[in-house]
């Protein structure tokens, strides 16, 4: 029986596509967090302004402005959630593309080299370096993903 071992975590995180995506999403997340912090600061200022004006506003006007602030708060929370969900979906989409590509590569490599089984390194207590195909899969995945990215983008 001929067996190979692969470190899937290293492959999934080590491809240029994964690293580029992580960096892109990190930057987008930082930009969004900065924008959200500014929105929160502005919101806090408006709440404080309303508190100060409470004594001089009519009850009707106060309740109207308070209602506007509540709506603004809900809208801001909704936007934060929406951005977080979008970033998460994008990360999962790219991870799925990488995973599908890696699965195909592992199957092709197993057929080429006559492996009867390919096991994940994380499930093993020991495996000789000679049966580790991680680097080969990583190289092939990078090459295949670059081609796909240049055609349609990840």
For the regions a language model picked out, list residue spans one by one.
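Amphipathic alpha-helical segments
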Residues: 1-122, 144-154
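Conserved phosphate/pyrophosphate-binding and hydrolysis machinery centered on Walker-type P-loop NTPases
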Residues: 127
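Short beta-strand-centered segments that line the small-molecule binding cleft or hinge
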Residues: 134
């Amino acid at each position: 029986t001929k067996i190979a071992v692969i470190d899937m975590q290293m492959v999934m995180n080590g491809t240029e596509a994964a690293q580029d995506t992580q960096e892109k999403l990190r930057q987008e997340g930082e930009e969004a967090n900065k924008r959200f912090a500014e929105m929160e600061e502005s919101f806090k200022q408006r709440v404080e302004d309303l508190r100060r004006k409470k004594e001089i506003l009519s009850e009707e006007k106060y309740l109207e402005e308070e209602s506007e602030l509540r709506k603004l708060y809900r809208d801001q929370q909704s936007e934060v959630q929406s951005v977080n969900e979008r970033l998460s979906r994008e990360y999962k989409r790219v991870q799925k593309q990488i995973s599908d590509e890696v699965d195909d590569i592992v199957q092709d490599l197993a057929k080429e080299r006559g492996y009867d089984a390919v096991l994940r390194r994380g499930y093993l207590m020991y495996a000789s370096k000679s049966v580790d195909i991680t680097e080969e899969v990583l190289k092939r995945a990078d090459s295949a993903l670059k081609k796909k990215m240049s055609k349609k983008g990840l």
